[in-house]
Amino acid sequence: MVDFAGWSMPVQYSSIVSEHLGTREGVGLFDVSHMGRVVVEGDQAAEWLESMLTRQVRDLSVGRSRYTLITGVDNTDETVQCDGDPVILDDAIVARLANLEGGGHRFSIVVNASNRPRVVRWLKACLPQEGVRLHDTTEETAMIAVQGPLVFGRVQEGILEGPLRNVFSSEILEKVAALKNYGVLETEFDGKPVLVSRSGYTGEDGVEIISSSLSAVMLWERLLEHNTTRPCGLGSRDTLRLEAAMPLYGHELCETTDPFSAGLGFAVNVDGRNFPGADGIRIRRGAGGRCRVGLVFDSRRAARTGDHVLLSEDGTESVCGEITSGSFSPTSERGIALAVVDRVVGNPGQELEVLVRGTRLPVKVVSLPFYRRSHQ
């Protein structure tokens, strides 16, 4: 167990490799209750979030979610304003829930554990005097990710036989299985509301379930009762997301990251919008001389964050980038890494070197992601 943003978290239950491969081949169960969970609601909730997030939300249908960035400006903690150098406070998933009975809008936002205090403080500071309410539900809820090709199991006599069958009725399970990627469903477990999202952080099919903290142990135990399911810790979650080329705050993005160079341009809608730091991000669009790439080693050795990427040409050597995340890949059985490099050396097939603890290791640029599931 390790401390992670104030939460006691397991790095592994058995081994990182076995948990990783178990998720790729069966079902991995992840307690991700450390992630921050916020509910935003009110008559002006959609309009307010439209002014706070880098992705549009007014066109988000009920029952749908999307990836976004939460931005501020260079003095975010002191002053609420939109002008100034952009600061990326976090990346997040925003979901549109069923409207309130009185007609107001409801949204769920999931943020990173380490950034939750600052993000919640910033959002609360930006709230209008009326029309929007924000509630940090992290302490009163839990979040469990169920990931892998056998999450829904196989159909036996018209019934899905995966671990979710231990949690939901056949009728609800059919609705969950019918969700498209980033679809969400509000339902119940143990007589209490739950939010089920067809999403994850592993590159596999699966769902993430937000439940009452009072029901979390029962939910976890019910899911573990299925013979395809195994518990997984932070270690395998990181290697799985790396193979899927999913960004991690503090690695692929930080306060000063240019989202376009980091491969996150899809998460930024700047045209005609004025979220915090929008002007600064608009200036960066198209101006970046760097790009995010995948690097594959020809051995099991792995680079670490901050290691230099080198280009050797005509007898000279120059630093052309740096590693943002690196690890041994249990699926391919060799080292892989995400890096930000000069755009001129970012094409697939480009041969480079990485300086790992004083040793130059050859790498090749490859298309991302490193792993793409074959079972759709």
Give the residues covered by each predicted segment:
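Conserved, structured C-terminal
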Residues: D3-F4, S8-V11, V17, T79-C82, ...
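Glycine-rich, Trp-frequent "lid" loop and neighboring beta-strands that shape
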Residues: I93-R96
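Generic internal hydrophobic packing segments that stabilize the cores of diverse globular domains
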Residues: A46-E50, Y67, D91, R106, ...
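Acidic, proline/glycine-enriched N-terminal capping motif
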Residues: M1-D77, Q81, V87
